[in-house]
Regions:
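Structural core segment of the AMP-binding/adenylate-forming
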Residues: 1-68, 80
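Residue-level signal for inorganic ion chemistry
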Residues: 17, 26, 49, 169, ...
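Adenylate-forming
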Residues: 26-38, 54-55, 150, 177, ...
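Conserved pre-ATP/AMP-binding loop-to-beta segment of ANL
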Residues: 72-92, 96-97, 135-145
Length: 204
């Protein structure tokens, strides 16, 4: 079960969040390595740290390089999910520390599909219909090209900005810069012909 982590959290918030989630693996960009170093000794449940090289810091001692871990890994057997499997999203902690909200796949996925329908997406009756729907949308040049202008650790950014387009064969455009740069956002909109811009005003 993966969880979202707010990139602006300080050490005490990160310790609480990762401990509360019973996290066993942490993926982090190199620019956050100093913050991770400062808390790793207080997180005994973490079994592995995987660092994504962003050109800012050398590989943290004890961490595994993300790209190397992929290239050296063997193909894993596929395992089936059930409706009882959990997807967990941590709240923003505006009324105390963040809370882990658990959604069963059997309830979350139908809810997302209903949202997709309300937004104009064609929802398949059966998974076997999905390929046809995506093919038709591509031929009609109506596939979603979404830019989540709010952080992906926010539910709105992840659900509306990323999940829905991916569910329907669309494209998700991301911006590598932290924070909100309106000029950069509009440059990406024009460059990638974005037709869905998702934003939350106070989530930066």
């Amino acid at each position: 079960v993966t969880i979202n982590v707010n990139y602006i959290y300080k050490e005490n918030e990160l310790i609480y969040l990762l401990d509360n989630a019973d996290a066993e693996a942490v993926f982090f960009q190199g620019c956050y390595s100093e913050r991770i170093k400062a808390i790793k000794d207080q997180l005994p449940k973490i079994k592995v740290y995987i660092q994504i090289d962003d050109g800012t810091e050398p590989l943290m001692e004890g961490a595994i390089d993300y790209e190397s871990s992929i290239s050296s890994s063997k193909e894993q057997k596929r395992f089936d999910r059930t409706e009882e499997n959990i997807y967990m999203l941590y709240t923003g902690g505006t009324t105390g520390m963040p809370k882990g909200v658990m959604y069963k796949h059997g309830g979350f996925i139908p809810s997302m599909l209903k949202t997709a329908f309300a937004m104009g997406f064609e929802v398949p009756e059966d998974i076997s219909d999905l390929e046809k729907i995506v093919k038709n949308a591509k031929e009609n040049d109506s596939l979603s090209v979404s830019l989540p202008a709010c952080p992906l650790m926010h539910g709105t950014g992840m659900w509306l900005g990323a999940f829905l387009p991916m569910f329907s064969g669309g494209t998700v455009v991301t911006i590598s810069d932290l924070g909100l740069d309106p000029k950069k956002v509009w440059e990406e909109v024009v460059k990638n012909k974005v037709n869905s811009l998702v934003i939350v005003g106070d989530a930066f």
